[in-house]
Amino acid sequence: MVDFELVRTASRPRCPTQEGGVVIRSQSPVMAGINDDAAVWNKKWKEEVRLGIIPYYMFIARDTGAQAYFNVPLVRAQKLYSEAIRSTSGLCRTARGPSMSCTPGKVEVVGVQEVQGTEAFVLRFLQCRDDEWIGKVFFAKFDPKAIWCARRVLTCCGAFPALS
């Protein structure tokens, strides 16, 4: 787990960079056995705000390399995010997540919902190669074991390339 004492020792309330007007934002991957605990994320975001750092993203580690050792299923990552953000102040709620950088753009896992009698992931584009899709909500086939972009899109606003 994250050693917040080490972070606190290495940090000052405001570093010289911040005093010069630089804005610092944080992003971190959610990783099994390291920070896959809502209390860790909650504490992390609160500590960052105390240090003048803006929480930015909780992201899903890419589907490469050692991902098999550290992966967290999308449905669990979304529950961790929701639970962690629920008891923070508005200053911490700038953190988005969980998100993934896929071929068409950055996708946020919003939740799970029944769509036409089928369970589906509710996803939203945070960034996208096609500006028209930014902020659009769409659905993808639900798989409780999914650790990366769902491959089969059920519905979206207009034509949409397959996630990969």
PLM feature segments, named:
Residues M1-T88:
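Conserved AdoMet/S-adenosylmethionine-binding subsite of the radical SAM
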Residues V49-S164:
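Auxiliary Fe-S-binding modules of radical SAM enzymes
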